[in-house]
Amino acid sequence: MLRKNLAAHAIGVLCFSSLVYGAEGDDLPQRAQTVSDVIDKPGVLTPKGQWSFDSSFSYTQNSSNKVSVVGYTVLPTLIIGRIEVSDADRTTLTLGLTARYGVTNATELEVRLPYVYRNDQVSTRPIQDGSSEVVNTTMDGGGLGDVELAVRHQFNFDSAPYWIGGVRVKSNTGRSPYDVTLGDDSTSFSDVSTGSGFWSVEPNITMIHPVDPAVLFAGLSYIYNVEDNVSIGDTDADVDLGDTISLSGGMGFAVNPDLSFSLGLSHKTILKSKVNGSTSDEAKLLQLDTFSFGVNYAYSKRSSVNVSAQAGLTDDSPDFQLTVRVPFNL
């Protein structure tokens, strides 16, 4: 029973962990359907010599409210400049195509091509002027995101827990935030970024422990951003984006051979960034916590539909993210 459950869930949860339903005795091995396919993390690997693909669509909504001083302070109670209240709503749509190839039964290669569309709406009101006028600014655009390459290896097969390690390399093919110029009004940008602007390397390890009919999973990763020289205004600077430490864990549960769901928690700590080797006094650690719920339905032996929702638990986290993925095995 445990083997059948593990074989039927593995393709639906590659991100957080896995369950797999596959008919024993099939001539061709099938890629597992995992709880991680619902949330997009490493999981059961592609069999040797086979290809697997998946298309994905994600919707992310994020909003922020802040009060800023445009000017400087002379004394704690004396402000020179304007006080502005701004409200920003950012919507991001991402279409992704991922291809995986099984080098061996224990090792797979992956490439991911994303297309990113962003719509940013910012409302600003200077409250010190006594004016009720609100300035609305809308910026939108899209393009190729940061292409990613990855390799994963499953270390053991005979006994649980199963351990999968990997390395993911993210390129800077997307439009960098530092390549976006100011518009004619000098208050808004002419376009939006579709990438981070930096290369990064992410080693990661995932633990999967089947407890029939459930699967427990946990993951640890570290994102190292490669320092680069960028143009900030009229000057050049060496920017070292803060690295990211990620922890995740949760549970996948098999309702029947075709349907499973997952619950998960994820925590990310983004370290302080540096410019020209020094850290600004205004820099701070960012803490991102999210709760995830996903459902995986295998409608055929070679394909399934995965729907997941994530809710932000901290101020720095995205408010909401919805992802739909359709894996397909050749």
Which stretches of residues belong to each language-model region?
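Outer-membrane beta-barrel biogenesis signature
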Residues: 21-75, 175-177
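Residues on the lipid-exposed face of transmembrane beta-strands in outer-membrane beta-barrel proteins
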Residues: 42, 53, 57, 97-101, ...
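Residues that define the transmembrane beta-barrel architecture of outer-membrane proteins
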Residues: 49, 91-95, 133, 137-147, ...
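Detector for outer-membrane/organellar transmembrane beta-barrel domains
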Residues: 49-64, 186-275
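Transmembrane beta-strands of outer-membrane beta-barrel pores
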Residues: 57-63, 113-119, 155, 169-175, ...
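Outer membrane beta-barrel transmembrane domains
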Residues: 66, 72-76, 229-330
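Repeated loop/turn-to-beta-strand initiation elements of outer-membrane beta-barrel proteins
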Residues: 107-109, 159-163, 213-216, 258-261, ...
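Outer-membrane pore/translocation modules
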Residues: 117-234, 283
